């Protein structure tokens, strides 16, 4: 209920174009913009930026 409104599940897709995704929760109050995190992409075996997908 309220949990899903404040902290929705978001998909983080790799900017390397591999199609690899992470799924996480984000706090809309603290991060109203699209989330960008630098995480490991096991397909290309490198750290790359992952952007929030809507």
UniProtKB/Swiss-Prot annotation:
Single Gene Ontology MF annotation: structural constituent of ribosome
Keyword Ribosomal protein belongs to the record: yes
Listed Pfam families: Ribosomal_L33
Domain of life: Bacteria
Key words, A-Z: Ribonucleoprotein, Ribosomal protein
Record-linked InterPro entries: Ribosomal_bL33 (IPR001705), Ribosomal_bL33_CS (IPR018264), Ribosomal_bL33_sf (IPR038584), Ribosomal_zn-bd (IPR011332)
Gene Ontology cellular component annotations, sorted alphabetically: cytosolic large ribosomal subunit
Biological process (GO), any one: translation
Family as reported in the entry's similarity comment: Belongs to the bacterial ribosomal protein bL33 family.
Protein name: Large ribosomal subunit protein bL33A
Organism: Mycolicibacterium paratuberculosis (strain ATCC BAA-968 / K-10)
Gene name for this UniProt entry: rpmG1
